[in-house]
């Protein structure tokens, strides 16, 4: 299983997690596939779009909680589909009511339907309101290092910069900005959006990200269960490579075999 060692836990809002792979619950063909993919990913935190997924809003419809029970998983309600701070705050309050006072939430305030980029002004506004209201906010944002630091200073418990547009599968487009965010952060930095395959996830972890959240890369794969397993292994490999420390890049060769005692 892709689980960090106990001494290398991902800590969010004071709670340790062994898995650094966070998964979404949308786009799967049914709830059973959602469950199987989540298990294959060994995810402990799963995000839920409150405006799109039933977690009790409709008592007559199948509920995600039937396959991903809160006593086994940390549910991370998100505000996907919100375009204003007001809508996002209202959605978070609804989620807290449905989940019996659960305060951990993923804030998304989108700027437009074509790019699904975050509206940074509305995101800042919503983050301030939610933190003041007692929420533990994990926030989706652009890869702007200044904005990421500002969201941390507001009190967000994790900052989640995009690697590329949501659902694009383009992979990490700006390593420099991500490194700037990581090096200056005192809260977990979790790549959110844009991952397409296992190598993208590994690169994010090799850069020093604390985790990766993904949905489309798994749910949209030809074999979602197998891809979830691949992502789990990639996260583990990338994290171990980061901790091990890569060798520096050089322009010239460096022999790997010792030269002492060479014949001739």
Curated annotation (Swiss-Prot):
Pathway noted in the entry: Cofactor biosynthesis; thiamine diphosphate biosynthesis
EC category name: transferase
EC number, as in UniProt: 2.8.1.10
UniProt KW Ligase keyword: no
One CC-aspect GO term: cytoplasm
SUPFAM superfamilies assigned to the protein according to its UniProt record, in alphabetical order: ThiG-like (SSF110399)
GO molecular function terms noted in the UniProt entry: thiazole synthase activity
Reaction catalyzed: [ThiS sulfur-carrier protein]-C-terminal-Gly-aminoethanethioate + 2-iminoacetate + 1-deoxy-D-xylulose 5-phosphate = [ThiS sulfur-carrier protein]-C-terminal Gly-Gly + 2-[(2R,5Z)-2-carboxy-4-methylthiazol-5(2H)-ylidene]ethyl phosphate + 2 H2O + H(+)
Compartment annotation: Cytoplasm
Record keywords, A-Z: Cytoplasm, Schiff base, Thiamine biosynthesis, Transferase
Residue positions binding 1-deoxy-D-xylulose 5-phosphate: 167, 193-194, 215-216
Assembly information from the UniProt record: Homotetramer. Forms heterodimers with either ThiH or ThiS.
Biological role: Catalyzes the rearrangement of 1-deoxy-D-xylulose 5-phosphate (DXP) to produce the thiazole phosphate moiety of thiamine. Sulfur is provided by the thiocarboxylate moiety of the carrier protein ThiS. In vitro, sulfur can be provided by H(2)S.
HAMAP family: ThiG
Family: Belongs to the ThiG family.
Name of this protein: Thiazole synthase
Organism, scientific name: Xanthomonas campestris pv. campestris (strain ATCC 33913 / DSM 3586 / NCPPB 528 / LMG 568 / P 25)
Lineage of source species: Bacteria, Pseudomonadati, Pseudomonadota, Gammaproteobacteria, Lysobacterales
